[in-house]
Amino acid sequence: MSTTAPFGTWPSPITPGTITTRTVLLSQVRVDGADTYWVEQRASQAGRNVLLRRNGDGQIGEVLPLTPADELVDVRTRVHEYGGRAYAVDSGIIVVSHAGDGRLYRYDVAHRMRGLVPLTIYGDVRHGDLEIDTGRGLV
């Protein structure tokens, strides 16, 4: 049986929390050989940006391990607080900007046991719109 109620006063199972905590934004799509990478911003993890990969076999998963300080990587750059691309990938080598400490890290997908290798030191420096130049060995 239905109930009549004034406009805007009926109960709803959808709350602002339902919408905001389940939101996932996708960005920064890149292709490296048979692999596709992208960043997911997850509201359920306080807006943390996570790097994901779909390999040639169709398997999807998070790519990066913990930082050397045992932090979850937040793939984000603070250039102008908007950034640009916060990671680059070439031939399975990933360079990523971690918002937690502002540093760049290198990660080799084929040699996972090496973990994240810091490329920069701590400091008030911003990195953004990353690209890898393998010919000159530059990021």
Identify the meaning behind each predicted range.
Residues 1-139:
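Beta-propeller folds
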